[in-house]
Regions:
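Nucleic acid-binding interface residues in structured DNA/RNA-binding domains
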Residues: 1-117
């Protein structure tokens, strides 16, 4: 079975352009709803060579804001990447979850995804 970090990457790869998910949502999909911080660590641990394959910018905090704390990427960079995909931020830097929130994966979809890895 893939490591938790690898499972995070597989789930994040399923988030389509123009949609966002929260760290907690990704953790909950993986059956670990209290592991939001670990999802953040997984994304912060991406090597530059893997960043093109994992759309890390599509994961934001549960309030609908960018909350990156990574020396390689600034918050403005993550917001710019999302805006280029059509995600809109209000004047205070919030995303409307109803418009841009990802519906996630069903347990059946997750099982199939992990079985293929």
């Amino acid at each position: 079975m893939a490591s938790f970090f690898d499972q995070v990457y597989l789930v994040v790869q399923q988030i389509p352009p123009g949609k966002v998910a929260s760290y907690g949502q990704v953790a909950a999909i993986l059956g670990s709803p209290r592991a939001a911080r670990t999802v953040g660590w997984a994304l912060a641990s991406l090597r530059e060579s893997n960043e093109a394959d994992v759309p890390w910018q599509r994961v934001i905090n549960s309030q609908g804001r960018v909350s990156i704390r990574n020396l390689r990427h600034a918050m403005a960079e993550q917001q710019a990447l999302l805006e280029a995909e059509g995600v809109e931020f209000d004047a205070r830097g919030y995303v409307d979850w109803r418009r841009f929130g990802w519906d996630g994966l069903s347990p059946v979809e997750l099982e199939a995804l992990l079985a293929d890895s």
